[in-house]
Amino acid sequence: MFSKKQLKGKRETMHNSICVIRRILRDESNKGQRFRRLLMSVGWQIWKRTIAKPIVATLFNNCRFIAHPDCQVSSGVFYFRVPDSREVKVLRRWLDGGVLIDVGSNVGLFALSLADKVDHAILFEANPLVALRARENMALNSLDFEVNATALSDAQGEIYLEDRGKATVANRTLLDPATTTYPVRRVPRTTLDIFLKNRLKPIENLSVIKIDVEGHENSVIKGMSSTLTELRPKIVMFEYLQRTKFHETQKLFGAVGYRIYRLDKRNEFIEVVGQPDPLQNLFALRGDTEPQTGE
C-alpha cells in the first residue's frame, strides 16, 4: 500500500507526464515528427535514469548541444525540434547579423538556436556550473561567443542566487536571502550599461536582447537604460511572471521609447493593453519598428 504522500507524488508525476505529452503533440515545430519526438522523449528519460551521462545532440540549425541528465533545459532538445519554437522563429525572422545579448542564458541553448543568425553573442549566467556548461557548448561549436559568470541587475557589487541544486532553471536572483527557503550563494553583479562601458571592444550593432532571470527582469532593465537609449536594439524579449510589476516594466521601456507586445496564436505581435497573462515571453519593440509576424 502507498502512503498518502506517495500517492500524491505519483499523481503529480502522472499529471506532469500528460502535460509533457500534450506539449510535444501540440508544438508547431514538431509537425511531421510528433511520434518520433515522443519516442525521443521516452528514450531520454530512460537514458537519464540508467546511463546518466551527457550526450551530444544536434539542433535544428546543425549546432551541437551537450545534454546533461541533471539539466532541465536538455529535455527540450529531445522533446521539440525547435525548443521555444515560437520565440525562436520570431527572432530568427528579425535577425540578420549583429549582436545578441542573452541575460540569464542558462547553458546557452537559446544562443545556439540563433547562432547562425548573429555575428556575435554575449551571454550572462550567474550560476558558475551552468556558465561553465554554456562555455562548453560554445566551444563545441567553435563559437567565440562570450559567457560571463555574473548576474545583471541595477547596481554593481554582489547579489544572492538561489541554489536549488544541479542546473535548474528556477534559481532566482535575490536582494534578501530571507525571501527564500533554499540555500543561497553570493555572486557578482553589474549592470549592462556599466559592462558595455568598460568593454574594450564597443558594440556597433546590437540587434536583440533576451532576458530570463526569474522575476528580476525589472532590475535588469533599469540597468540597461543607457544601452537602450544609445544602441537602440530593435527588440528586447523578456519573461513576464506573476510577481513582476508590469506597470513598472511599461514605465521603464516607455521612458526610452519602447512599446510592449505579446504574441498571439498566429505568432503576430499584439500590443499589450492592461495587465498581460503571466508565464509568457513579451517583446519590447523600438518605437520606430514595424511589428513583423513569425510566419
What feature does the model see in each segment?
Residues 2-295:
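Phosphate/nucleotide-binding beta-alpha loop and adjacent structural elements of enzyme active sites
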